[in-house]
Amino acid sequence: MGNELFLAFTTSHLPLAEQKLARYKLRIVKPPKLPLEKKPNPDKDGPDYEPNLWMWVNPNIVYPPGKLEVSGRRKREDLTSTLPSSQPPQKEEDASCSEAAGVESLSQSSSKRSPPRKRFAFSPSTWELTEEEEAEDQEDSSSMALPSPHKRAPLQSRRLRQASSQAGRLWSRPPLNYFHLIALALRNSSPCGLNVQQIYSFTRKHFPFFRTAPEGWKNTVRHNLCFRDSFEKVPVSMQGGASTRPRSCLWKLTEEGHRRFAEEARALASTRLESIQQCMSQPDVMPFLFDL
């Protein structure tokens, strides 16, 4: 029994050769003598015996639990908790000056560190734009001038209020395919048609799910525009010959597209009316959009 206790760990999980080696060591190594020889304790604060090397702690120097160590920790915690309250309060003028200096330093550091943000962030899987779509994006960016700093603040505050009013609601995806979304935008717009960016804006306005959805849905809109016979591309002529490139193309519904949407809109109204209204930012306008 003494030899088995002399092992530092069990050997049952080891290979057979190592188990035999451990047993051999047990035979040649002499275990310590039991019982231990008692010796008088010079400090007289514990039992009169000297612990051997097998023991993890020395019972002569271990404090009783819940007495000395706990009280010391509590004293340190009390000291740390009283330190903030012991500081003298600052004057009102000093506090206001420090607040102003802190705000100025934060604004300067944020203006230096933060790079200018782009208006739209596309995912890595975005398709390459065609020449017409690139021209369309350039036209949109050139026609829309950036607001000045004193005009940008009211715009941002208005957007924040709109977002906060709908922050507690998670919008679900509307039970509509991309043909329905594109046809809704085209048939409820001007007769001359819409470009791709205007179709995006119409979809985000009436179906808030696409405001926070991944950017891949825009690629699917382009795909459906190019590969369906329900939509036609209407090129726009040059602007008075002043520019060297044509304007971006517009999209319109064909006769087949109007007929197909009218049939599918009646079917959707009879089966998914409530679920579609729950996904819309303005459910009351659904009869007008779908011409029900």
Curated annotation (Swiss-Prot):
Tissue/organ expression: Expressed in testis (at protein level).
Gene3D superfamilies: Winged helix-like DNA-binding domain superfamily/Winged helix DNA-binding domain
Regulation: induction: Induced by cellular stress.
Extent of Acidic residues compositional bias: 129-140
Pfam families linked to this entry: Forkhead
Biased composition (Basic residues): 149-161
UniProt main location, coarse: nucleus
CDD domains, A to Z: FH_FOXR
SMART domains, per database record: FH (SM00339)
Composition bias type Polar residues, residue spans: 80-89
Annotated Gene Ontology cellular component terms: chromatin; cytoplasm; nucleus; perinuclear region of cytoplasm
Keywords: Activator, Cytoplasm, DNA-binding, Nucleus, Repressor, Transcription, Transcription regulation
DNA-binding region(s) in UniProt: 173-272
InterPro entries membership: Fork_head_dom, FOX_transcription_regulators, WH-like_DNA-bd_sf, WH_DNA-bd_sf
Listed Basic and acidic residues bias regions: 35-47, 70-79
Region (Disordered): 31-50, 65-166
The keyword Cytoplasm is assigned to this record: yes
Subcellular location field: Nucleus; Cytoplasm; Cytoplasm, Perinuclear region
SUPFAM superfamilies: Winged helix' DNA-binding domain
Function: Transcription factor which acts as both an activator and a repressor. Activates transcription of a number of genes including the heat shock chaperones HSPA1A and HSPA6 and the antioxidant NADPH-dependent reductase DHRS2 which are involved in protection against oxidative stress. Required for normal brain development.
Illness: Defects in FOXR1 may be the cause of a severe neurological disorder characterized by postnatal microcephaly, progressive brain atrophy and global developmental delay.
Name of the protein this chain belongs to: Forkhead box protein R1
Organism whose genome encodes this protein: Homo sapiens (Human)
Source lineage: Eukaryota, Metazoa, Chordata, Craniata, Vertebrata
Gene (name only): FOXR1
